[in-house]
Amino acid sequence: MELKTSDVAIRLGVSPKTIQRWVRKYNIPLRRNEAGHYLFDEKTVALLERVKFEQGAAMEAPPTPKRPPTPLRNNIPIDALHESIEPEIARVSSRLDQLERQLEQKADDVVSIQLLHHRQEMEEIVARLTALEQLVARLEQQLNNRPPSSHETSDEPKQKRRGLGRVMGLFA
C-alpha cells in the first residue's frame, strides 16, 4: 500500500513539511509519482515512526524555569508608562464612543427618512385606490340609472343589408 506525504503526516501526527524535512535530512530513498510527490510504503512509514521517536526524545529537554516578566520596559517603569498612556487611552476611548453615537444617529436618520418615504408612497397608493373606488362606484351608478336604449331592448333580429355589407366587408 502506497501512501502520500499528507497521509503519512496524519498517521504520525506531524505536519507534511516535517515529513519532507526528515526525508531530506536522513536521505530516505523514496519513489515519486508522476506529479513528483513522494510515495511511502509500510517499511518507510516504520522508519519515519522511529525517526519521530528519536526526534521526540531529543527534543524533550528539561523544562526551563520561567522567569517573571521584567517590570521595566526600555528603562521606564511600567507604572510611569501606564500613567503616560492612560490619558491617551481615555481620549481614544471617548472619541470611539463619540463616533459610535454619531454612527447610531446617522443610522436612525436613514431609517427615519426611509420610513417617511414609505409612508408617503403608501398614502399615494391609498389615495389612488380611493379615487379608483369612487370612479367604479360612479360608473356603476350611471350604468344602473341609465334608461335602456331602444337597440338593446328589441328582440327583433337585425335585417341584413345585402350588397353594401359584402362590399364593405372586403375593405375591412
From Swiss-Prot:
It is found in: Cytoplasm. Residues 5-25 bind DNA. Residues 57-76, 142-172 are annotated as: Disordered. Residues 142-151 have a biased composition (Polar residues). Residues 62-71 have a biased composition (Pro residues). Residues 83-146 form a coiled coil. InterPro entries: Chrosome_anchoring_RacA (IPR023522), DNA-bd_dom_put_sf (IPR009061), MerR-type_HTH_dom (IPR000551). SUPFAM superfamilies: Putative DNA-binding domain. Keywords: Cell cycle, Cell division, Chromosome partition, Coiled coil, Cytoplasm, DNA-binding, Sporulation. One of its GO terms (biological process) is chromosome segregation. It comes from the Bacteria. One of its GO terms (molecular function) is double-stranded DNA binding. One of its GO terms (cellular component) is cytoplasm. HAMAP family: RacA (MF_01170). Belongs to the RacA family. This is Chromosome-anchoring protein RacA. It comes from Geobacillus kaustophilus (strain HTA426).
